[in-house]
């Protein structure tokens, strides 16, 4: 293996020598007197600490195309300022999540050194009507532990049947003179919101503020701490709080707030977040990947949340890219957790009555997302082990009544936006709907039980969700059992 020197020697399971040594010593010490155990523990800790983490390498590239074709080109290769924050014993991703998947392979031996699944803005954009009429280019990045010898970057994408197809390969030589090793100054002070341990053994979650002026930096920190508390009051994050480090970065903005083009508001914010992504007034994204990476590289991170300093309802979340939320909205708590579910665990949207920019799927294939199914074979349902024997598949619920009420609600919501009514009126409508839906779902025969409830992934028919209610479906405050398990699986991939 060709990572930095301390990680070259591994066992057959891919465990680096220091970690393997520590495990063997620990197993042996269980049989030793306490004094000897204590001495050997000190030696083990000291020896393990002597091995430094590799550097963090980032491949910035351009992703160009239309709904039917796509091209890739290298932008630059960067060595980020901080060491690799991840666990080198968990370099390989076996979760099979994401629309895309990349591998870092030793060019000589073809051994896979690192891999991760992910989704992208391009992957969403190519399903919109705009992608049928024109081409666009998006900046994207892949981050991985810096190798010491040439590697191949292999990128795969799911085809229409959800099989992986190789779509791009490029070679990186870490000794190339054009690898950018410049030391860039941080644009913001790193705030340790919650530090539970070494980044290599924890999930590292970075919260970035956008649209906060220099006078509002204390507000950012208060917002970040408030929403962090919300996340860790929600299961299963609550039970795994000690597995997370949380960091904050907030470069000062020249003006307060972020862009909202549909209302004529434009801001040159540090990270470039904006409402109206893909023409959806509530969808908040940044298309400026360079700006995001310039800020983020000064913190140890695997996951990013961008807090937009705005009141208007909105947010977004893309698996293994980032999530966003309008920090001042009355439903920021819900949006923060919901969108982080997308970003962190690849959870699908389970709702289907709200308007979206994406075109409907031409055929029903089994989704890669862990909380949605096409139910092509009920006996092979991916969460079948959580279904009680007396729960029918598909699982009945008052779908027609829900859809009738939801149509009326969406009409009222659209009128509030069209009339440019105050955000407080929209929040009042959301509270009214939340109260109504909560009572309706709790009255369901199969409430709180895992089954297969039709209606998910923006489609009324053909896709099914695990429970009648979940934070990925409505504005409730909890994840369903299937989503909780999916989240815990990702926590395990990044912590120990």
What are these regions (language model features)?
Residues 243-319:
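Active-site-proximal segments of metallohydrolase catalytic domains
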Residues 177-235, 248-258:
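Fold-level signature of zinc-dependent metallopeptidase catalytic domains
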Residues 51-139:
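N-terminal prosegments of processed precursors
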Residues 37-47:
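Bacterial N-terminal signal peptides
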Residues 340-356:
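Catalytic Zn2+-binding segment of zinc metalloproteases
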Residues 132-199:
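Extended acidic/polar, glycine-enriched regions
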């Amino acid at each position: 293996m060709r990572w930095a020197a301390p990680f070259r020697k591994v066992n057959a399971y891919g465990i680096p020598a220091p970690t393997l040594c520590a495990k063997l010593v620990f197993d042996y010490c269980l049989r030793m007197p306490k004094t000897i155990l204590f001495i050997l523990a000190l030696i083990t800790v000291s020896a393990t600490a002597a091995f430094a983490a590799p550097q963090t390498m980032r491949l910035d590239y351009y992703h160009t195309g239309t709904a039917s074709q796509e091209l890739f080109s290298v932008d630059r290769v960067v060595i980020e300022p901080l060491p690799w924050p991840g666990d080198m014993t968990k370099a390989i991703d076996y979760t099979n999540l994401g629309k895309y998947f990349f591998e870092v392979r030793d060019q000589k031996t073809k051994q896979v050194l690192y891999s991760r699944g992910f989704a992208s803005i391009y992957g969403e954009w190519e399903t919109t009507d705009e992608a049928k009429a024109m081409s666009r280019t998006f900046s994207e990045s892949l981050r991985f532990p810096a190798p010491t010898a040439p590697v191949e970057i292999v990128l795969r994408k799911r085809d229409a049947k959800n099989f992986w197809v190789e779509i791009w390969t490029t070679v990186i030589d870490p000794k190339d003179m054009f690898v950018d090793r410049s030391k860039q100054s941080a644009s913001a002070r790193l705030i340790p919101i919650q530090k539970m341990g070494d980044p290599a053994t924890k999930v590292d979650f970075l919260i970035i503020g956008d649209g906060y002026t220099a006078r509002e930096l204390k507000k950012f920190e208060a917002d970040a701490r408030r929403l962090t508390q919300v996340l860790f009051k929600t299961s299963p994050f609550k039970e795994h709080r000690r597995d997370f480090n949380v960091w904050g970065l907030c470069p000062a903005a020249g003006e307060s707030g972020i862009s909202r083009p549909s209302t004529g508001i434009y801001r040159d914010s540090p990270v470039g977040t904006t409402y109206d992504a893909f023409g959806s007034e509530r969808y908040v994204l940044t298309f400026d990947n360079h700006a995001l990476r310039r800020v983020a590289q000064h913190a140890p991170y695997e996951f990013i949340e961008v807090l937009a300093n705005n009141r208007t309802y909105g947010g977004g979340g893309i698996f293994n890219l980032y999530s966003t939320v309008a920090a001042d909205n009355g439903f920021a708590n819900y949006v923060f957790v919901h969108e982080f579910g997308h970003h962190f665990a690849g959870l699908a949207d389970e709702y289907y009555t709200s308007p979206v920019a994406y075109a409907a799927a031409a055929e029903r294939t089994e989704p890669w997302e862990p909380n949605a199914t096409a139910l092509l074979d009920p006996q092979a349902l991916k969460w079948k082990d959580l279904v009680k024997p007396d729960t029918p598949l598909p699982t009945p619920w008052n779908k027609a009544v829900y859809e009738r009420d939801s149509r009326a609600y969406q009409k009222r919501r659209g009128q509030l936006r069209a009339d440019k009514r105050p955000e407080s009126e929209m929040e009042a409508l959301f509270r009214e709907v939340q109260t109504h839906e909560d009572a309706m779902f709790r009255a369901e025969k199969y409430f709180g039980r895992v089954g297969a409830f039709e209606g998910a992934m923006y489609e009324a028919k053909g896709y099914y969700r695990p429970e009648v209610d979940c934070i990925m479906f409505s504005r409730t405050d909890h994840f369903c059992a299937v989503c909780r398990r999916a989240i815990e699986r990702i926590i395990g991939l990044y912590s120990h």
